[in-house]
């Protein structure tokens, strides 16, 4: 992995459009359901499909795989796509303000019932795939899936699918009769199974002990048959499969287990999506409480996808649920994330999901959940609400955190908190795109401000359930006036009076009180809020959301201006523009309106050299001193443009190959002859291998392997 240097083009081409000479082409508003690249204005509702609503009992599994009472939470309970359709049509989701749903992986899963320690287990969760090009019949038919997409879109709801390309299903290297032997099918045609794997579709290095990143990538996750992404058949199959789901109209993809797949392959996978039909993508890289992982943030910044924001979730749980940290810890997390993430507003925030205990505990204080929901809905990032949170569902780890939703009440306070705050993401860009600043704090109280241009939202939370907080000396960016609590007092909030200079009148925040005050106004200058996708090749159309001007102006990649024909559409809240044929690398994006007023810089956009394929680079006999590692660089931006600081690595040497052989799977331009070399690094000391630059012609599709010896 690497961080690219920013490129500044040496040429500048100014685009000047005379008013009235060219009528502006209009894009959709940034809040539109058709905006598949930007979810900052959305609230996601995560649905475990089997546990939500049974809309069609006829498709329920039979026999030992099904428990209609949902007592055995490891069996199917009956939820399906028709059930989700019904809850869209009856207003349950739209009434809550939900504008995106994230559903279980829709692909066909194994049918076997597996006995683990005397307990029957099924693929109700959707993570035991057998055919990525067919649907799980327990969820519905392909027509049912299309109906779900159409119904959701008709109600202004986007659809995100879970997708797990890391593995197929449980398998045993010693027993081909166990479960379904991890078999993989291509639209019904068998490609192969885990045992007798003559085509090398899977990894066969045993189970991971999670000791290193390399160990987790190339060894099996538990007993799941780990797919070999360096196999051309697997690579092409998975990319064709995701194209099929994109063709069906999905708006986003949540990629499972990104920590456990080669990073280079995932970058080429994202390139395939972005070059085909760009949608919002985010991955799952689990982090525990206070766990620090530089690789986690590096992946978020360089892979082409966002991440589920586990540091956010874990800190919110510590502060609002467990009382193991205070508001200063919450502030530190928010401020640290501004540095750690290149684009913090793209990360998906949450307080619980199917991989952790539910936030709410049995007989716990409901106000804790309500405050955590308010915090998530008004904080930076894209909020995701786990199904049933609005009904105060509780439950420990898997499978207790995946129970059937008990009711669909629209009168719970939690439902109303979501209902009142979710619309702010579309009505106030400060919530969708704004910066975050702490305005008042002590151990139990935080007041923070979100600001985008002159749009402002101020949020106050007192987590102390027994003691009111006397708020004095609060200064905000709100104009002078009186502001009602957006929550309408349901969490004991109050009206805020603001005087000259943003100074708020002293007030008392009730025990357990939460209030939200907000102000919106028109922009006076362009301001960028979101760019998506954040990685693509020249010629791909990207979407810039924020506030600009109704009159078409100029978009810049670095100092290179886009010409008129390459500005596909222009509207006050959204611009669509084609990437110019500039050298591959990292660029700043900015917008200037017709009057010449310039926007803020949106940085870290990667222009790829071209279509991407994955190549495994292997170097033999590369002996190193203690603390020294081997890296790879070359003449394209994907290899660091010969800069040792941007070289790929450190390479691996433990699982697929062992020291002194090193290897790494890298995303490189397809169908091109590239130059490359290996080097050794220890701190700032760099030792290049000798000899001439190496060359390799990459394939136009599939994967390849380069295997060479170290040149002294």
Curated annotation (Swiss-Prot):
Where located? Secreted
CBM20 domain residues are: 607-712
Q: Please report the name of this protein according to its UniProt entry.
A: Cyclomaltodextrin glucanotransferase
List the residue ranges of the region (C). Answer: 434-522
| Domain IPT/TIG, residue spans | 526-606
**Enzyme nomenclature, EC number:** 2.4.1.19
Q: How does it assemble?
A: Monomer.
Please list the reactions this protein catalyses: Cyclizes part of a (1->4)-alpha-D-glucan chain by formation of a (1->4)-alpha-D-glucosidic bond
Chain spans, region D = 523-608
Active site residues of this protein: 256 (nucleophile), 284 (proton donor)
